[in-house]
Amino acid sequence: LFRIFHGITLYTFHSISYKKKVLQDIVRSKEKGADFIFMCMHAGGQYNLLPDRYTCNLMRFLLNTPLDMVIGHHPHCIQHIVKKKNKVGVFSLGDFCPYPKCASAELASPDVFPEYSIVFHVYLDENKVATNSFLQKKTFTIVKSIIGKDKIARVYPLYRLIELEKD
């Protein structure tokens, strides 16, 4: 959608008319030559381990459009992904750098692990756009946010933290 608007477009999905507008924009992006269309979806309840019905319906709607991938955020904890043919929908990658002891983090149940997040790696092959098989590989890295003695939050790959503990 960036190619159409050359900026950020915000949508509110609380009515059918907005869904129609989003669909028109996605179709227009394809018509203007977009090779890949990724959407960032800000939806879902904070610290919910599972997406709510509204968010699931929204994801289903988006994956039935010409979008290639939906990356969700807002719940502040990791949620699952869904696949539909060559498309991927990520409900929530977590809270990349939460600040423990902040008001919203205090509301989180300990079993949602808000200090952990996922960095999602997507490998594309632009030579396979015509066959719609350009999404070659998906991998991820688990990261953890840690507040240092200097009160600065730093994000570390979990594997690196495990290696540091061995030393």
Q: Can you annotate each of these PLM segments?
A:
Residues L1-D167:
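Acidic, metal/ion-coordinating pockets
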